[in-house]
């Protein structure tokens, strides 16, 4: 949408989007919005506030702008509508950029614990990173207040801590090799033209 030549006010729209990147609404208005929408203590409270990133939107925009307009025009002449052009031309040509955006979102969401600590009250719904944070904090606090009789439990606490760190790191380590071939290409395509 923002890469097309015939869109009026596209520079103004981009300025508004970039403005939100530098000056966000803040934590309290976001919390009040999530609470008033009835999303508090649901998984959607963690997903929706971070669903669209301005930085990733700019990368996608520059990636789509690098696709030649001749393909768009040729598909229109052949009778394709906007949905067909998007799904059969733009998406296949943007696999590298989509893989990079997927990796950015995956790593960012996987490592996020702060939003979950604000929006989730039920311990059953805590994500792994928040559970890991609680394990690390409780283990650190337990080692500070323990006396000689607790030395046996310190080894168990350290084992649990390191096992939780491995479990939290493993999914990203498994996914990254499959996306790595797209990663460098997608980052370069998204940064060259703009």
Question: Which ranges hold each PLM region?
Answer:
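A hydrophobic, multi-pass inner-membrane permease signature
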Residues: 1-194
